[in-house]
């Protein structure tokens, strides 16, 4: 299938417009696949993103502001998502010693184990791009980087 068939639109203003619509459509499609992958463990794709960010910085804590800056979806309500992870004991929060207005967030052992479990299913996530060769995936990544300048 192509984007024209997927969204039932035959005409676009130009190829850049078509590419932009295709990127947006593909973003939604990939997020749905990612949701299927992480929902098996009872978390959302935004929670998964935060846990991965925290694991990458572990054991050093991050403020919610630092987490938001690193998130894929910058429009997410980071504080609310962190609170949901806290209620699942996947993260812990501590008032920042340097600035009491900030909260430091770290991933817990339970959060690390959950990510380890999801890492064991990484092939399922890689399947999202299974129609691409390694070379094509690399080329796509370079093109997406180029779009962002």
Model-flagged regions — what are they?
Residues 24, 52-59, 119, 145:
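Short, locally clustered residues in the helix-turn-helix/winged-helix DNA-binding domain
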Residues 64, 82-83:
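Short, hydrophobic-biased segments on the C-terminal half of alpha helices
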Residues 22, 49-53, 113, 139:
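Pre-recognition alpha-helix immediately N-terminal to the DNA-recognition helix
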């Amino acid at each position: 299938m192509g984007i024209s068939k997927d969204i039932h639109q035959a005409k676009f203003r130009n190829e850049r417009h078509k590419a932009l619509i295709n990127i947006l459509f593909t973003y939604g499609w990939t997020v749905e696949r990612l949701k299927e992958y992480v929902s098996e463990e009872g978390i959302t794709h935004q929670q998964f993103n935060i846990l991965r960010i925290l694991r990458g910085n572990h054991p050093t804590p991050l403020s919610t502001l630092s987490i938001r800056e690193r998130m894929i979806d910058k429009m997410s309500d980071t504080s609310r998502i962190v609170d949901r992870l806290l209620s699942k004991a996947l993260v812990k929060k501590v008032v920042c010693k340097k600035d009491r207005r900030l909260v430091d967030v770290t991933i817990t052992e339970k959060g690390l184990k959950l990510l380890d479990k999801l890492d064991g299913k990484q092939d399922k996530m890689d399947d999202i791009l299974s129609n691409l060769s390694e070379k094509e995936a690399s080329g796509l990544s370079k093109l997406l980087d180029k779009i962002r300048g």
